[in-house]
Amino acid sequence: MAFVSAWFLLGGLGHFVFTDFFVGIVPPYVPWPLAAVWVSGVFELLGAAALLVPAWRRLAACGLFILTLCMTPANLYMWQHPDLFPSFPPTLLAARLALQAFLLGCILALMLARDEAPLARR
C-alpha cells in the first residue's frame, strides 16, 4: 500500500511540476490535454491520500485502478511513437508499460484485500 500511495503522490505532484512534459505525452486524440493533466494529477493526489485512510482504501484503489487504465493510452502512445520522445530509449518506454501492468496488479491487490481486523474493544 505504501508503494502505491507514494507512486501516486509523486506522480500527482509531477503533473504540476512537470506539466509541459505530461501535456506532451497526451495522445493527440485526447481533448484538452492541459485539463486532462491537471485533473488526473488532482485525482492521483486524492487517491494517494485516501489509500492511507483504512475506511477509504478500497474505494481509493478502485478509483486509482480506473485512473491508471485511463492513463494507459499515454504510455502506449509514447511506446508507439518513440521518434517523438528521443530522450527515452525504446527499452525504457517498454519498461514503463511493464511497470504499469505491475502497478495495476498492486492496485488490484489493494482492492481485493480483506480489511484488517478492528482492534478489540476493552
Spell out what each predicted region is:
Residues M1-R122:
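Membrane-interface extramembranous regions
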